[in-house]
Each structure stands twice: as C-alpha cells, then as structure tokens.
Amino acid sequence: MTEQYQHRARKRFGQNFLHDAGVIDKILRAIRAKPEDRLLEIGPGQGALTEGLLNSGAQLDVVELDKDLIPILTGQFGNKPNFNLHQGDALKFDFNSLGAEPRSLRVVGNLPYNISTPLIFHLLQNASLIRDMHFMLQKEVVERMAAGPGGGDWGRLSIMVQYHCRVEHLFNVGPGAFNPPPKVDSAIVRLVPYETLPHPAKDHRVLERVVREAFNQRRKTLRNTLKLLLSSDEITASGVDGSLRPEQLDLAAFVRLADTLSEKVVTE
C-alpha cells in the first residue's frame, strides 16, 4: 500500500488488516467469484480482498463503517465500473436496498471480531437473499458454528446458524497474516443457506427464544431452564427428556420444543 493510502487500524472498530498474499489468494480461490455473481463485501478495510473480487468481473457492493477508509477505497477502486461503495454500519444495513434477486447475494467479509456474532444473526434474518457467505472470523467462533451436540461449543450460535445454513470450516489463519496481529487465531468459514430447511420450525422467533432461555443456564437441566416457557409434561410431550442439559439436545429436538411452545401460545 502506498504512503498516500496508509491508515492506522482502529481498536474501537476491531480492525486487523489482512496482508498475507498467500492467505488472500486462498480465500479468493475458496470463493471462486464469477462475472455473473452479485457480491457484497462487509468491512473491506484497505481492500485486501476487494481487488481480487473486482478482478473476477462480478458486481461488488462494499459496506465500510470507518469514514477514514472511504477515500482510500474510492482512490483505489472508484474507477472500476463494477464497484459500489456504501459508508455505514453493516449491523443496520438494509440488504433489500441492493435490489438483489432471492438467493443471489454472495457475502464476503473479514469481520471485526467484536461484532461478528450479532452481524451473523443480522445476516441470517436476510438468508432468503443470500446464496452463500465466506467470512474470516475468530477461530473459536467458527468452531462454535460448526460444533455438534454434546460438547461445550454447542450452543445458541451453533443451533441458529445450522438451522439456516450448512456450515463448512474451511481453514485456519494465524495472527501473522494481519496487521496488527490479533491475539487469537482466525478461521475461514463458508455458510450456505438451505433452499429447504431440514428442520423447519413453525416460528423461528420462538425457536430463538427457546434456545436463548435453554442456554442462559447451560449447566442446568431443561426442566429448570425452560420452566417459565414449558412444563415438564410439555417437554416430555415434545419427545424430549427434561432431565437433560441443553448441550445434549440436537437441532431437531429444539425445534420440537419450539413448536410445542408455538402451539401453546396459540391455544392460550
């Protein structure tokens, strides 16, 4: 990067700029962007991935919060006909404003670790617009996303992401690939929203509520954590053992509990 475009990473934005050419190339090869694609990059930073994405010929919208990076990105890529820059907070961004067709958006990002989980949940609310997502995240977060029942990593994030998406932990990235180096390892994850949900809930908001309540006290039994929502008999009627802890249940079991609660709310 030339001196004209130098920018110091800001801690309050959780900025760690990717600079390792080998890692950048590996990410771009995992994405395999094509000219007919509609790409959305969240947090382009200094444009480490942006140039390669633009070179694919695909239409690229980028969302960047840091106002100081806007002239840098405009200076580097503003003359590209397939580049469209949005200054703002991705957590508040209206993805419908892009006018994308259903299941057409390919979302990419080296996400700031301090907002990665809420941003993932925001994106899941727009899953019907998204074809796939490729993110650089804290390795621990990716492990939680990809986790299965029975372990300590299985929780609210695992369940809600896997409700909407197929999860692939692609590869890990060490701190040295960034400037400044983060204090944790990173990983690349691919999320592919399902065309047809394998375990559809009657109301996904009720599922979110049940999962949140269950894992608020994850060491307690379901009979205790869900007592304000469901009785012991209602848990049993859902085909679930109320003496189990939440981490012992799979996604399908949580959907059954949520559907029981949905029916209860309707009848009441």
From Swiss-Prot:
Protein name (Swiss-Prot/TrEMBL): Ribosomal RNA small subunit methyltransferase A
Q: Which gene encodes it?
A: rsmA
What Pfam families does the entry give?
RrnaAD
Enumerate the InterPro entries for this protein: KsgA/Erm, rRNA_Ade_diMease-like_C, rRNA_Ade_Mease_Trfase_CS, rRNA_Ade_methylase_Trfase_N, rRNA_adenine_dimethylase, SAM-dependent_MTases_sf
What are the GO MF terms of this UniProt record?
Answer: 16S rRNA (adenine(1518)-N(6)/adenine(1519)-N(6))-dimethyltransferase activity; RNA binding
What Enzyme Commission number(s) apply to this enzyme?
2.1.1.182
Primary place of residence? cytoplasm
Q: Signal sequence: where?
A: none
Q: Which organism is it from?
A: Pseudomonas savastanoi pv. phaseolicola (strain 1448A / Race 6) (Pseudomonas syringae pv. phaseolicola (strain 1448A / Race 6))
Q: Is Glycoprotein a UniProt keyword of this protein?
A: no
The UniProt entry, under PROSITE patterns, shows: RRNA_A_DIMETH (PS01131), SAM_RNA_A_N6_MT (PS51689)
